[in-house]
UniProtKB/Swiss-Prot annotation:
GO terms for molecular function: 2,3,4,5-tetrahydropyridine-2,6-dicarboxylate N-succinyltransferase activity; nucleotidyltransferase activity. One of its GO terms (cellular component) is cytoplasm. It is found in: Cytoplasm. Pathway: Amino-acid biosynthesis; L-lysine biosynthesis via DAP pathway; LL-2,6-diaminopimelate from (S)-tetrahydrodipicolinate (succinylase route): step 1/3. The lineage of its organism: Bacteria, Pseudomonadati, Pseudomonadota, Gammaproteobacteria, Legionellales. It comes from Legionella pneumophila (strain Lens). Its EC number is 2.3.1.117. Homotrimer. This is 2,3,4,5-tetrahydropyridine-2,6-dicarboxylate N-succinyltransferase.
Length: 276
């Protein structure tokens, strides 16, 4: 545990006794250092280590401490003003800084400080919350939301109105993770720390939480909380044992390898559920 992490951990344990007036300058500086590190990609709330996702809870604790200790302030967005504890990421960015970032930000896209946006990303009018990590080549389409501490991989397309859930509270919850080369269909919601593994396609209007049944029609298996790599997923229903009703589920209709995913259009993959 480094000194920065130790300071954050200790402060979080004593958070009930902390206020802006009682917090030390060292603590305020430490929180700002974490937010800056999240903002520029130096820190990530979650990262893949030896093939497994590891969550750095202390970074989430620093974000929560910022909400407790930082005062609200005026945020001037030009066309109107806001009043919040966390400033916007691009408020003071110059033309040169935007060019260096390689990010395209369409009017009315909102990104909070502490979110990392990698190059070749396009932000349509959308919302990206603090602690989120968006890797290279991502499209965040109109009215899509990327929640606090969500992790978005390379070349992901998040379609219009889709929601990727945030997880600052409860603190023990893991962030929602979308791995590389995934397509998230319009108006879908993926929340509660669900992991969508690489090269997967989530159809329009699919809802995935930790309690959502994920039915694999190829194997007949039911799982929770994770979409396997290369899956094509649509919304469906599973009947009850007595046949009196059915309940919502997500259905894996097909699994494809990386070569097939690269060659075949999204629409062709989604038509797989019309085969029978």
């Amino acid at each position: 545990m480094n000194s920065l992490q130790a300071l954050i951990e200790q402060a979080f344990e004593n958070r009930q006794n902390l206020s802006l007036n009682t917090a030390s300058s060292d603590l305020i500086n430490a929180i700002n250092e974490v937010l800056s590190g999240l903002d520029n990609g130096q820190f990530r709330v979650a990262e893949k280590i030896n093939g497994e996702w590891t969550v750095h809870q202390w970074l989430k604790k620093a974000v929560l401490l910022s909400f407790k200790l930082f005062p609200n302030q005026i945020i001037d967005a030009g066309f109107c003003k806001f009043y919040d504890k966390i400033p916007l990421k691009y408020t003071d960015s110059s033309n040169e800084q935007f060019q260096q970032s390689g990010v395209r930000v369409v009017p009315h896209a909102m990104v909070r400080r502490g979110a990392y946006i990698a190059k070749n990303t396009v932000l349509m009018p959308s919302y990206v919350n603090i602690g989120a990590y968006i890797d290279e080549g991502v499209m965040v389409d109109t009215w899509a939301t990327v929640g606090s501490c969500a992790q978005i991989g390379k070349n992901v397309h998040i379609s219009g109105g889709a929601g990727i859930g945030g997880v600052l509270e409860p603190l023990q919850a893991n962030p929602t993770i979308i791995e590389d080369n995934c397509f998230i269909g319009a108006r879908s919601e993926i929340v509660e720390g669900v992991i969508v593994e690489k090269n997967s396609v989530i159809s329009m209007g699919v809802f995935l939480g930790q309690s959502t049944k994920i039915y694999n029609r190829i194997t007949g298996e039911v799982s929770y909380g994770r979409i396997p790599a290369g899956s094509v997923v649509v919304a469906g229903n599973l009947p009850s044992h007595d046949g009196s009703h059915s309940l919502y589920c997500a259905v894996i209709v097909k699994q494809v390898d990386e070569k097939t995913r690269a060659k075949v259009s999204i629409n062709d993959l989604l038509r797989a559920n019309q085969d029978d």
